[in-house]
């Protein structure tokens, strides 16, 4: 489209979505609960983890050692992709983590006796990551019979969750890595989208406001300009980033949508959260989602939708950001979802033209 947004069948596609970090290792009941609730709320896209490195979680591991992959471990992820397709949901699958949860870059550093930022520089570590990416994207789902790279339920591959390289505040190291890996992913999955998965930090020297500063070696405008990166991602956590007021988030949303439009690419607020009582949080989420709508943003994912355990109790609120269905927050987000994408139906496996472009 002329403004650089998502499109399906020639029509613009905007969405409201969510995150969930346990679809790839929890049981079917728990995964189905999350995905069904997402569909009931009217969400279109779910962002989930597609990695589990080193130590198992609940007995499941995907990459127990470098270049070693556990086929049995992929069963929950296969099921989640299959079930998402049945429900007409699209998935954003993240390929590694900046943080130690489920292994991620810290696990690669341990494996290779390296420092965190060596992940973005050393060829041996890059080769390990590339091998992992090739294995995941090319694998055949036991439930659908399709390779992941051909599955319309998978909308996007993300290089990493919140990658940071603070040892190079210029941003050159992270940009070079993202350029190499986004091109590689695009070769493996040419009909699916590619995003970096970063937080949207601006990388400005001498900027006193942390998310706009160069502290973590992330330069968002350079990342979204990369030719194989299809859209820009940004996160929003004012409490964690410097105890800023909720109103600060309106500026953050505006700036990213504006700057993505300048390079004719979509911008997605793919994580946002605020810890507070439900009424206070609802007011803040209403202001932020209204801003996405008002500034003509392309999509957003709140952090995070959880479902029910095997015994039908609610999943624990480990980080204080849990959203459950039904709730007043879910009702608020359902209204936002309806305004973002009021007329796009569900897209099951094999739907023609179902990949956003």
Q: What would you call each of these model-derived segments?
A:
Residues 331-357:
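Terminal, non-catalytic domain-edge segments
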Residues 269-271:
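Glycine-rich anion-binding loop/nest that anchors nucleotide
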Residues 1-258, 262-266, 276-329, 335-336, ...:
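Active-site mouth of glycoside hydrolases
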